[in-house]
Amino acid sequence: MGKPASRGFSARTRGWGHLAACSALALLTAACAQTGSPESASAALPRENFDYVGWDQYLGGSDSAQYSALDQINTVNVGRLEVAWSYPAGEGPAPQFNPIVVHGTMYVTTADGKIAALDPATGRELWKSEATGRISTRGINYWQSADGSDRRLVFLNDGLVRAIDARTGRYIRDFSVDLRDALPAGHADTPRPLMTSNPGRVFEDSYIVSLPAGSGYASHPANIQAYDIRTGALTWSFNVVPRVGEFGSESWPEKDRERFGGVHNWSEFTVDPELGIAFIPTGTARSDFYGGNRPGDNLFGNSILALDARTGKRLWHFQTVHHDLWDFDLPNAPKLMTITKDGKRIPVVIQAAKHGFVFVFDRRTGEPVWPIEERPVPQSDAPGEHSSPTQPFPTWPQPFARQSFTEADINPHIPQEDQQKLREMFRTVRNEGLFTPPSLRGSISMPGHNGGTSWGETAVDPLHQRFFVVSREIPVLNTLLPDSRPDVAANMPNGGPGIQPYNTPYNFLMQSNGMVAIKPPFSFLTAYDMNTGKILYRIPNGESWVLQQQGITGAGSQAPRGGPVATAGGLLFVGTSGDRTFRARDAASGRVLWEYKLDAATEGVPAVYEVGGRQYVTIPVGGEGLFAQKGAPAPGPNRYVTFALPAR
């Protein structure tokens, strides 16, 4: 057995931060008081008076629940769902957007970089904004003043934080923030706009967002910023790469410390509106697959950060991967609920990870609900690399994704020649299971950095304490290739002698017929009972287009992207991009109760809302999907498709 994460390592760099050495709640609370953790650590349970009826923010609300308390559409009548209306999104990239509905108006983005206001009951266009350029692809934010006189949509637009009047679509001219203005010294001359697909979050009168960061060695740190929504003034900033003297600074080399970057919250995050805590999952320190130049654990990379949403003060953290070499960043918004364990009610935050684990913490304190062990892992043989000797392994719940890929797992549905090439590959590469480091001869990573789960792919049912995860099975071959470009070496932060940069081309082991290398199922839908941590079901998520044409079912959609939404009607709505199907499942069993064939992929998150006493479900549709299989017909137009029960 491995050793608990709370023992044997510096509490400043391992496990759950300064709380790691505490075993009793009294000691834990004392440690919190000394180092700035939330005063609510020993307080009463939060009331959790969340509004699950509306859908006025990305993923439904700032709590990111992807849950609706509406139950007009339920397990009994869902089979009668029909298309109520659709709205064309225009030519261009497929929509990955999660619509919001506020004060009887739906807001969506279009392919030409505009925001459209729609009648949510009919899809009739009310207006289009004058915005041009790229807008955050996944979502936008709604804010209004206390008296409701000032109503704004806040979003990223070509690297600027912009706002438009939610009634008219006109720009608010005296509000604009260039994210480059917040870059630390040494990075302020970045010529390109800082743009991300992460929509950020509104909390009270602040807009919180992570600075974008590139994937190269010279990337700037993706600090987390908060801006006053009325004035655009910077109200606080949190350094994701700690500066000298800050907590976690010793997890980085002293040399070139100010030049290290990354640690980007590229996906999405959650704000608990009652506790006033922002739960922010972070990405990898740069570069993604080689860290010889950055010895140490590299806080706050690959961490769930609990920050005071009003001040930016760190309350607690947990690092899920030390010194990441696999691009195993945390890809989705943490989920909130209250569970009952050993007779006690615990308000938890739940984080699903790319490498297939589910991490569960008391969200007030950061204490793990189930033990997390530090276990020895394979070590790097790459020149100059300093891989971590151990990594955190949750002892419970069980993983939702496969974490190994061997010769026995080769896909039998790919050509024999491809199968033989894979067998030969296994004889030469490193393949020692999860956390096999990248190498010069190539290393298998399973699930790879595009496997496991991703943005928008988790949901909760807070009434039944269920947690849902959509995942995909995509092994990767990580091969380090020396990068001899002089400019790369010159710009590489170098925390040690004799270090040279390496490049790791993406190799998802896609085969000649367009299928992944691993045998089906290619994707799963997993449901957990969070009171016990047990898996309720783990079932294939959708179908493979190619195999379905051959009469083979139950293979799972290849690389679905976009998320589920649970409802009080006992349903789980989820689209599967590869087979172009939108389904309603029984949330308790996973059984398909209704499905609708679309003419294009679904890659966004559905929105569930009610207008005029009628419940609707809207899903963005467009494109052929990620890693589309060969032979599928050309996709239909980009659009938003809305379903409802027949009008009375």
Model regions: which residues?
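Repeat-blade elements of multi-bladed beta-propeller folds
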Residues: 55-59, 92-112, 134-160, 192-218, ...
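C-terminal motif of bacterial Sec signal peptides marking the signal peptidase cleavage site
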Residues: 28-31
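N-terminal pre-domain segments of enzymes
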Residues: 34-72, 388-419, 423
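Short, solvent-exposed loop/turn elements at domain surfaces
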Residues: 61-69, 92-96, 116, 288-289, ...
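N-terminal secretory signal peptides that target proteins for export/translocation
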Residues: 1-14
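Long, low-complexity segments enriched in small/aliphatic residues
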Residues: 391, 395-476, 484-485, 498, ...
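Beta-propeller domains
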Residues: 216-219, 243, 260-267, 316, ...
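Extracytoplasmic/lumenal domain signature
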Residues: 76-90, 115-135, 147, 161-191, ...
